[in-house]
Amino acid sequence: MPLRALLVGTLLLFAACAQPPPPQTDLLMPTEAQMKLRSLQTRTFEVADREAAIRGVISTLQDLGFIIERANAPLGLVTAARFAEPNFRDVIGVTVTVRPQADGKMLVRANAIYNNQPVEEPEVYQNFFAALERSLFVGREER
C-alpha cells in the first residue's frame, strides 16, 4: 500500500509540473464566421449628427420593448435588455455602438445575445435596422 501511495503521489507531482501548451498565435484573429456575423450586425446610415443617431437607437430599442440600461453619448454606446416571449424567463440583451465615419455618415453596429449566446440570425438584425431607419427618417422629418 505505501508503494502504491508513493507511485500515485509521484505521478501527481509530475502532472502538476507539466507546462501548458503556449497560446496560439492567432488566438485574437477573427474567424470567418465572426466576420460574417459582424457584417450582419453593421449598417451605415446617412445621419451626420451622432446625438440624433443615438436618440434614434434609443427610440427604436424602446419601441421594440427593450429597457435601456446604459446610454453613453460620448462613446456612442447604448445597452438594453428585455425578457423574451412567450415565457418571459429568457433574456435578450443588445449593445449598439454608433461611430462617425469620415464621409459624414454614422456606422451603427448592433450586437444581440439571447441567454448569453450570440444571435446569428440575419432577420433579427435586418428587422432592427429597418426599424432604426424608420426612426431616423421620422426624426429627420420632425426637425
Please name every model-derived segment.
Residues 1-7:
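Bacterial N-terminal signal peptides that target proteins for export
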Residues 18-143:
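Ser/Thr-rich, low-complexity intrinsically disordered terminal regions
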Residues 13-16:
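C-terminal motif of bacterial Sec signal peptides marking the signal peptidase cleavage site
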